[in-house]
Amino acid sequence: MRHRGIFYLVNALLALGVVLLFLQIKDIEPLPPQEREKPEEIFSVSDKKQRFLAALAPVVGRVHDDLMQRYLQVQRWLEQGRKQEAIAKLKLEYKVDTDPELLQALKPHPPSVALAQAAMESAWGTSRFFVEANNVFGVWSFNSHEARIAAGEKRGEKTIWVRKYDSLEASVRDYYRLLGRSAAFKEFRQLRMRSDDPHELVKKLHRYSEKSHAYGEELSAVIKYNEFTRFDGEGY
């Protein structure tokens, strides 16, 4: 009987301990669930290129077509001696004096050239400039009053800035405008009046990059390997 009493006492104490432990656990606030970190999306080279072209090829094509229509319109105005005031404004904008120089400035080059430059300058749409600033072509900014972001490098003690655009289309239009009015690309403009061959045109873009003439060779290789001339349409 004595042993049986001790047995019941031990069981009662154990039961009481379990109850007390349960009550303590209820009073403890549960820890917030840990959010699982999502792994960064990893794309193959092929996927990256497809995403780049899906985003940019339609934009480049649309801008090119718009600029070509403007070029043909201005060409008709000059032939007919019309719209002198509008022509004067365009000459001022593009920093030219003569009618032939204006046509050189306005004629757009093939989309294949623009896409090759975009691919190289933005690392197929993965550069910080492309993602954060819609800056497709790595265009620098020298105006502190315009929208821009700091680059990750400097020239001596000076910070390099690149332009920030509201859209990819705004970036593409500014790029065509840059090549149409900068003195650095005068030979390029002269050549595109005589030829629409992208592999010839890129040879005159050596001043766009510190790579100099090797830059044109790389652009030509990008155009050929990725068959970018398929975006040039029947006119090319």
Where are these regions (language model features)?
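Catalytic cores of secreted/periplasmic lytic hydrolases that degrade extracellular macromolecules
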Residues: 2-116, 120-236
